[in-house]
A protein has these predicted regions:
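Serine residues within intrinsically disordered or low-complexity segments
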Residues: 8-10, 18, 228
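Tandem repeat scaffolds
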Residues: 26-234
Length: 235
């Protein structure tokens, strides 16, 4: 026996299912991460002058898809959401961006000085022609980041993930890349000046970090065997 639903009820069910599918698969999921259990100031999708952020404590601020202009100085934007924000040509000085979401951010030709980006996510970000000095990027996610023709001086990249990054024409000097992952990164035309390479060796005029990947990456590529397990002591 076939059960026949009233037409009004059938339409209601179809509408509900369609709405659920749109919510689950639509473009609304294309957003940055917000702080768990905490809501910061909402400055999303607008133009924000750097002076408005001067010396402000805006932890967990929402700057998603916003355009920042001018100089941003002495601001605490820790764990902020800057997903797909536009900061082209902006100057960042003494800014705390630890743990921030900067995926797909555009920092082309920007100047960063004494900026703390430890643990931040800059996947797919653009920093081409950027000037980075005294910047902390330890443990940051930088996969597929664009750093073409950028200048990096006194930059900490210990343990950073630079898989698939583009550093063509970039200059890296007096920086620390120990433990950084550079698999599939374009570093064929990168200049290395007094840099601690991923494997701990130091670059020189004849010694490029392109030839000194981290030990984990070298083992994965079969360049040298993994350390053998210790044998138990004889009774």
């Amino acid at each position: 026996m076939t059960t026949r639903w009233p037409r009004s009820l059938s339409c209601l069910i179809v509408t509900a299912l369609s709405s659920a599918l749109l919510v689950g698969c639509g473009e609304d999921d294309d957003h940055g991460r917000s702080c768990s259990g905490r809501t910061g100031k909402d400055l999303s999708s607008r133009t924000v002058a750097g002076g408005d952020l001067w010396q402000k404590k805006l932890r967990c601020v929402n700057l998603e898809r916003s355009t920042l202009t001018g100089l941003v100085s002495e601001a605490n934007l820790r764990r902020g959401n800057l997903y797909a924000a536009r900061l082209v040509g902006v100057s960042l000085e003494n800014v705390d961006l630890r743990g921030a979401d900067l995926r797909r951010v555009d920092l082309g030709s920007a100047t960063l000085s004494q900026v703390d980006l430890r643990g931040a996510d800059l996947s797919g970000a653009r920093l081409d022609r950027g000037l980075l000095t005294d910047v902390s990027l330890e443990g940051a996610q930088l996969d597929t980041v664009e750093l073409r023709a950028a200048s990096l001086t006194h930059v900490g990249l210990n343990g950073a993930d630079l898989v698939g990054a583009d550093l063509a024409g970039a200059t890296v000097s007096d920086s620390d890349l120990r433990g950084a992952r550079l698999r599939d990164a374009d570093i064929s035309t990168t200049t290395w000046e007094n840099v601690l390479c991923p494997d701990g060796s130091r670059s020189s005029a004849r010694n490029s970090c392109a030839d000194h990947p981290s030990r984990a990456e070298s083992r994965a590529a079969g360049q040298f065997p993994a350390p053998s397990a210790a044998l138990p002591d004889s009774p």
